[in-house]
């Protein structure tokens, strides 16, 4: 919901006569809408069946841990901490930025997504690899909602770098880079195999690729 509006705004400036509607939902709903031709595209980090759908890479996404500052676990981890600004600037992509050992947060309360969500699956795996099962106090359906709930300082949450850059900054958060394959994923645009791609669809995909080019 936070990724598409800027792209749609640019697209509408160029093609004002093309009608665009955005639908937000979980993977099950979105795949169903794509299957019955209710939508032309889906943007998702979940892997859809390649025999039914084609895909085009939108971006690489990294999962961070956002922790309210008041938790004592932060006190000895200053060398790992990232600010909202450093995530905006993508400083964490430098090889000198260390990933925090996740086991330091084994006693924290967590706000996570509901079971079955890709972010939840990855969060569970990261915690398991760190040797603990997270103490979950709240389960929600959207990353943005979990992030806003965590901003009340109830607990830590897993959040993608792409969303951190789109959502408001909260001074009482510190962010931590995470290690492991589960902390990195690809985000794709999906569309049905053998479906005719209109010029509008082609132009929209082209604009998403241009928008996501790295800055010089």
Please place each PLM-identified region on the residue numbering.
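Short beta-strand-centered segments that line the small-molecule binding cleft or hinge
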Residues: 6-10, 28-84, 174-176
């Amino acid at each position: 919901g936070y990724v598409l509006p800027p792209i749609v705004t640019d697209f509408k400036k160029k093609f004002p006569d093309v009608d665009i509607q955005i639908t937000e939902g979980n993977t099950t709903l979105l795949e169903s809408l794509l299957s019955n031709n209710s939508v032309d595209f889906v943007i998702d980090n979940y892997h859809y069946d390649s025999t039914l759908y084609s895909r085009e890479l939108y971006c690489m996404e990294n999962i961070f841990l956002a922790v309210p500052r008041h938790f004592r676990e932060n006190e000895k981890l200053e060398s790992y901490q990232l600010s909202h600004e450093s995530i905006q600037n993508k400083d964490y992509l430098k090889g000198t930025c260390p990933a925090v050992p996740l086991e330091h947060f084994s006693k924290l309360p967590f706000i996570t997504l509901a079971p079955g969500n890709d972010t939840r699956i990855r969060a569970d795996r990261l915690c398991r690899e760190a040797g603990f099962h997270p103490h979950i106090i709240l389960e929600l359906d959207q990353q943005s909602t979990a992030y806003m709930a965590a901003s009340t300082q109830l607990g830590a949450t897993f959040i993608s770098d792409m969303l951190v850059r789109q959502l408001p900054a909260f001074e009482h958060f510190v962010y931590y880079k995470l290690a492991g394959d589960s902390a990195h994923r690809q985000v794709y645009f999906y569309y049905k195999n053998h479906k005719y791609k209109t010029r509008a669809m082609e132009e929209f995909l082209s604009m998403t690729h241009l928008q996501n080019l790295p800055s010089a």
